[in-house]
From Swiss-Prot:
One of its GO terms (molecular function) is protein-lysine N-methyltransferase activity. SUPFAM superfamilies: S-adenosyl-L-methionine-dependent methyltransferases (SSF53335). This is Ribosomal protein L11 methyltransferase. HAMAP family: Methyltr_PrmA. Signal peptide: none annotated. The gene is prmA. It is found in: Cytoplasm. The lineage of its organism: Bacteria, Pseudomonadati, Pseudomonadota, Gammaproteobacteria, Moraxellales. It comes from Psychrobacter cryohalolentis (strain ATCC BAA-1226 / DSM 17306 / VKM B-2378 / K5). It catalyses: L-lysyl-[protein] + 3 S-adenosyl-L-methionine = N(6),N(6),N(6)-trimethyl-L-lysyl-[protein] + 3 S-adenosyl-L-homocysteine + 3 H(+).
Length: 308
């Protein structure tokens, strides 16, 4: 299979917007690199410092219409203008080169409260911790991205004991698997990408929770839900993008039990108000706010309690 890479060089303040635009355009993964020679000191757990000038590289499937060279060239000009990129370019990469580069970029990380994400080809640094063994493949969700970490942090704060959870936009399955390892009874994982469904099932097996997780494409999940007459769930996790989050609000509430909890991520600061407006009619205020908004750089996390 052939791939196209879109490279953008921009200031760190524009990185979150660039990531959001690349994902919205269909990027399968995004890597960040230093555009100069600026050193970064070892970060604290959960921190993700950035260089002043950053090169973002988005990976696109060149075998589909939205990933052809001409399309990606045009996309590079459009996104570069929006993020004030100092330069942009497109390159091709084959499977073997990408696999080598991809594996070398990952190491175990502690995300929250003794919860570790460990690539499946490495050994957990702390065998006594809660270790999620991951091979994300080409599905989104490695634990390195701010939106994933925001959701993982939220999950560790919830009482998930014997709860049924929906992980909508599951990517690699990392959030659903984390929920199971933190005490959930069962997880329904949903994603529009067949590769994500495959990766989720494989990662669930790696963590010995495949008997408690079912992964679906959206249309298959809807049919399954209706045919099996599934009871409303106690927890909903949706780490996708602002536009689909807004459109899915009325659908999500049909899947949720009264007083169930929801967390939403994948939106940047400028999108928070619109997403809040879409969900606030259905969700009660948290202790001090309608939603808890937690900022990791410019990415936002919203959470609330269903009143239906």
């Amino acid at each position: 299979m052939a791939w196209q890479q879109l490279h953008l060089q921009c200031e760190k303040d524009n990185v979150d917007l660039a990531e959001a635009l690349l994902l919205e355009a269909g990027a399968l993964s995004i890597a960040l690199d230093d555009a100069g020679d600026q050193p970064l000191f070892e970060p604290l757990p959960g921190e993700s410092p950035l260089w002043d000038e950053v090169i973002l590289t988005g990976l696109f499937d060149a075998t589909i219409e939205t990933g052809t060279r001409d399309v990606i060239e045009q996309l590079s000009h459009e996104i570069a203008a929006q993020v004030q990129a100092s330069r942009s370019w497109v390159s091709a990469v084959d499977d073997k080169d990408w696999e080598r580069e991809w594996m070398s970029n990952y190491k175990p990380i502690e995300c929250a409260n003794d919860l570790w994400i460990v690539p499946n080809w490495l050994t957990p640094p702390n065998p006594e911790a809660t270790n999620i063994i991951m091979d994300p493949g080409l599905a989104f969700g490695t634990g390195y991205h701010a939106t994933t970490r925001l959701c993982l942090d939220w999950l560790t704060e919830q009482d998930l004991t014997d709860k049924v959870v929906i992980d909508y936009g599951c990517g690699s399955g990392i959030l659903g698997i984390a929920a199971l390892l933190l005490g959930a009874r069962h997880v329904y994982a949903v994603d529009i990408d067949p590769q994500a469904v495959l990766a989720t099932n494989q990662n669930a097996a790696r963590n010995s929770v495949d008997n408690r997780l079912q992964a679906f494409l959206p249309e298959d999940f809807t049919a399954f839900w209706q045919q099996q007459n599934i009871a409303p769930v106690a927890v909903m996790v949706a780490n996708i993008l602002a536009k689909p989050l807004i459109g899915l609000a009325p659908y999500f509430v049909t899947l949720m039990a009264p007083k169930s909890r929801i967390v939403l991520a994948g939106l940047i600061e400028s999108q928070t108000e619109q997403v809040t407006e879409a969900y606030q009619p259905y969700f009660a205020l948290d202790p001090k706010h309608a939603f808890t908004a937690q900022e990791d750089q410019h990415w936002q996390r919203l959470s609330g309690t269903f009143t239906g």
